[in-house]
Amino acid sequence: KVLYLDCDVIVNGSLCELWNTDISDYAVAGVRDRINDYIRVYNRLGYPMSEGYINSGMMLINLKKWREDDFFKKAQQLACEKGASVLKNHDQDIINAIYHEQILMLPFRYNLLEYYLYVEEWLYLDRKYYPEIIDACNNPAIIHFCMPQKPWHYECINPFKELYYKYRKMTPWPEVVLTHKMQKLSRKQKIKGLLGKLGLYHIESKPTLRREVNVIEELNNVLF
C-alpha cells in the first residue's frame, strides 16, 4: 500500500494509526469530501449516494488491488467515455466512480479540508458528521489547504496558515514573498458568484434550513 498526499497539505500529527489501517478488503481509504451529500454528484457519476464520495487529496491506496484491476486502463477508458463534462473533479471523480463499492471511509481528522473550518460549509453535509468534524478541527492529523487561496497568498484566512510559516522557515526558501491570488473576475465569473449567493435566500425562505443554520452558528461558538 501507499499513502498519497496532495502537495497542499501539512502533516500535524502521527500517521501511524492511519498507516496501520487494514485495507486488504478495500481498494482505497479516504475522507468524505464536502460534496459527499450532493445528490447531483451521484447522478452524474452513476452510483448510489449511500456509498459516499471521498476527497482524493489524501488516500491510503491498496496497490495490489489497483494493479490487479489494471486501474490505469480503467481510468483511461472512463475518461474517454464520460469526458470532462461528467468527470468535473477529474481524478477524484474517476477514483470514486471506479471504486465506490470498495472505499473505506476514514475519520475527518486525516484530511481536514479547509471548507470544514468554516461552519457555513457544513450545510452541505449530514448533521451526523458534525461531532466528528468538530474533533477534526480541534485535533487535525492532516490539514488540507484545498481552497484557491493558499497560505502563501495574502487573501488566505485559514487559521492554520501559521503552521505553513513555521515549516517554511525550515526550508531553503524562508523569505519567499507572498503573492495575491485574487484576479480580475470575468463577467461570467461574476454571474456565477451572484448565482451562488441565491442559495442564502433559499435558506432564509425555508424554516428547516434556517434551523440548520442556527445549529451551525451555535457550533461555531463552540469551535471558535
Segments predicted by a language model, with ranges:
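Small-molecule pocket liners
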Residues: Y26-A27, S56-G57, A141
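Short glycine- and hydrophobic/aromatic-rich loop-to-beta-strand nucleating segment
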Residues: G57-W66
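A glycosyltransferase accessory/donor-loop signature
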Residues: W66-F224
